[in-house]
Amino acid sequence: MLDISLIMLSAGESSRFNAPVKKQFLRLGEQPLWLYATKNLSSFYPFKQIVVTSGNISYMKKFAPEYKFVQGGATRAQSLLNALSMVESEYVLVSDVARVLISKNLFNNIIENHDKADCITPVLKVSDTTIYAQEAIDRDKIKLIQTPQLSRTSMLKKALEQSSNFTDDSTAIQAIGGKIWYVQGDELAKKITFKEDLKSLNLPKPSWDIFNGNGFDVHEFGEQRALLLGGVKVHENMGLKAHSDGDVLAHALIDALLGAAGLGDIGELFPDNDMQYKNADSMLLLQNAYTLVQNYGFELVNADITIIAQTPKMKEFKEAIAFNIAKTLKTTPNKINIKATTTEHLGFVGRKEGIAVLTSVNLKYFDWMKL
């Protein structure tokens, strides 16, 4: 049996996908796409190691602690080099997680030809007339390169150490004089690059699971500046002490969103000892936090927010706060509920020393079927 490790590339920014969610975090059933693709390919062979490149190791490790994770680089080649530093096997199979339907027949065809060259590469032929710079070119000379590709580990490392400008393994190895062997590819191994590509593949729909998160924050009165709640000015000079602008409602809501998505807390995302957040606009922080939540495959179902304050009175501001939060999160105000209460003069809130906010949000998986 061949000594092979598997590398799955999953650190891309999905810039061409043009959707709120990064494609590797689209949910297929309950699994993120990267995990679905990795489990599919890893089921074909007892790989020595399974290494996944990642932009957020701590988050992805929660899904599959048995895998090895490595930080992605600025380019595909740099990510691959990082992953290769963890590989000890004679051969390495490299694939993109965006190719989710790789078949066992394709895999077997690659493995069976392992001794033919330094890199075994699946390709598709071009059937349509092909034009380059207004000139027709011989389509029989064109090959569409796919993954997975099987390489001798030492050869691939050597190739990428000499140049990191290549977008696939075979061209990197060929550039240093290595031999390439092409095998017939598979239409099902199509890479998801644009959102339209999803519609051509028979993939499981995202599950209907709901994820709840809670947030709580409290700030003390004491700054001679406006009191902001949900980005709405509630009082001219009853400002709250804070590293940022003191919007305690926005802070609690950020924590609830991050909690529901399993992405940590506000202190990790926006540290209060980081000067870039000094006097920061908390609604901008909220917007950035929700963008992150969307990137990881979630969208808002609803938010329920309780403002706990003895003073000032909140009744006349609740609607404006709900509308402003909805605008920031690019949703409709019916999904944002604002409540206000006092502590009946008990505790620090009752003594009018500060304001507390309790939030609860529900998230669901982004429905990529509607793209």
Swiss-Prot record:
Pfam families: IspD, YgbB. Residues 211-371 are annotated as: 2-C-methyl-D-erythritol 2,4-cyclodiphosphate synthase. The record marks R139, K191 as: Positions MEP for the nucleophilic attack. Residues 1-210 are annotated as: 2-C-methyl-D-erythritol 4-phosphate cytidylyltransferase. A divalent metal cation binds at D217, H219, H251. It comes from the Bacteria. Pathway: Isoprenoid biosynthesis; isopentenyl diphosphate biosynthesis via DXP pathway; isopentenyl diphosphate from 1-deoxy-D-xylulose 5-phosphate: step 2/6; Isoprenoid biosynthesis; isopentenyl diphosphate biosynthesis via DXP pathway; isopentenyl diphosphate from 1-deoxy-D-xylulose 5-phosphate: step 4/6. Its EC number is 2.7.7.60, 4.6.1.12. One of its GO terms (biological process) is isopentenyl diphosphate biosynthetic process, methylerythritol 4-phosphate pathway. InterPro entries: IspD, IspD/F, IspD/TarI, ISPD_synthase_CS, MECDP_synthase, MECDP_synthase_CS, MECDP_synthase_sf, Nucleotide-diphossugar_trans. PANTHER family: 2-C-METHYL-D-ERYTHRITOL 2,4-CYCLODIPHOSPHATE SYNTHASE, CHLOROPLASTIC. In the N-terminal section; belongs to the IspD/TarI cytidylyltransferase family. IspD subfamily. In the C-terminal section; belongs to the IspF family. Bifunctional enzyme that catalyzes the formation of 4-diphosphocytidyl-2-C-methyl-D-erythritol from CTP and 2-C-methyl-D-erythritol 4-phosphate (MEP) (IspD), and catalyzes the conversion of 4-diphosphocytidyl-2-C-methyl-D-erythritol 2-phosphate (CDP-ME2P) to 2-C-methyl-D-erythritol 2,4-cyclodiphosphate (ME-CPP) with a corresponding release of cytidine 5-monophosphate (CMP) (IspF). This is Bifunctional enzyme IspD/IspF. The gene is ispDF.
